[in-house]
């Protein structure tokens, strides 16, 4: 009986202790929740304060930026008005771009001063606010973007003006060359080579690309147009046309222009002949046609040639189908006492002298010296083949 009472007593005591422990834990949890709630209230208050400060700072920065943009636009308008007022004092030298560069430099210096001043003022005003958050909004970077855009525009204007300067100088130089040519009466010369061959084009050693073909009224046979493909910018053109029905095996090849690249050795012989004819025709444009014919006879004693200066393009025709050579060379033709060379570098050939005879092919940069014996051997080989 006593044991049962003791057991029931201990059970009751344990239940009371368990309930007291639960109440203590609940009180501790409530205290923690209350503490967290107080901290949340403090954080909310701090966040609202930060937002209010940010909004006020943003309004002040926007106001300052508006004032600075207005001042910079007024400065630029003032510069534009000064430029318009000074337009009537600009000399013809504006074509060379000197005054434009000075104006652009002055404008760039003024814009740099304005941007530097505005940045310093904005920094001072930001530090004077004293909020200490160092918040940089989107509007705060607008001024820097505007200054960068103005500098980029000035740089582009400089590039455009420099390109215009180079183009104006080139145009002036080209105009001077044209006036010089008009005064001296120089015209682009053409050299026609008439040869008998089975192929429609003479194997002159150069590489050509066909770019057109048409039929003329005077000759029903088609005329093909080629350009030199050994260089991308080579201005040399040639026309190939069969002569006529009575001479079906003869082709007329017309060369025009000057090569701007080195030629291979197999192309030097034809280039020497055509360049000599063109050079002598140009050098004889101011003299009589008889002197020009005498010079051509001196350089080409083996073939028939004709000169045509009536059209807009003075033309020399070398007829390789009709040999016009004597039994022996002329008495004044140089053999041992003089040198005979082909110089492909000088654009203005010197007139032939009694001791040194040079054939110039303007625009070329290679040299291919030929001796007198080798030159005569080539001519005799060609003449024997035609017979």
Curated annotation (Swiss-Prot):
It holds the Pfam family WRKY. One of its GO terms (molecular function) is sequence-specific DNA binding. Residues 197-264 bind DNA. Gene3D superfamilies: WRKY domain. It comes from the Eukaryota. Residues 329-346 have a biased composition (Low complexity). It is found in: Nucleus. PANTHER family: WRKY TRANSCRIPTION FACTOR 36-RELATED. Transcription factor. Interacts specifically with the W box (5'-(T)TGAC[CT]-3'), a frequently occurring elicitor-responsive cis-acting element. This is Probable WRKY transcription factor 36. It comes from Arabidopsis thaliana.
